[in-house]
Amino acid sequence: MTSSAAEVEAALAKVREIALALPETTERLSHSAPSFFVRDKKTFVNFWDDHHGDGRLALWVAAPAGVQAQLAEQEPERFFVPPYVGHRGWLGVRLDVDVDWDEVAGIVEDSYRQVAPKTLLKLLDDPAD
């Protein structure tokens, strides 16, 4: 199932809002996909629309140890092992099914936590410091 241009733009706008709210994040194209980086270096989210004809609107995110296998097995209609980065534990999150955006925000934050340095995690955990 491919998403309409309006659906893709709406989903990307929500992902941008979530990802760019995290400390020192940037967005740029990487491998032709909107991607989000910590300090413009480490990728923590890739946004894909119909990657190589897979028919999915999805995020690929860095996932905590064990999460990829658990979610891809328990909820294959929503989560999957993405190509190229799946062997490193990354998780595919479908955005073309019933999406819980609060859950997506938590997943994006978890991904950020996988790649961000401790100084930025401290900003995230203790913003008043």
Where are these regions (language model features)?
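Charge-dense, helix-prone N-terminal extensions
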Residues: 1-129
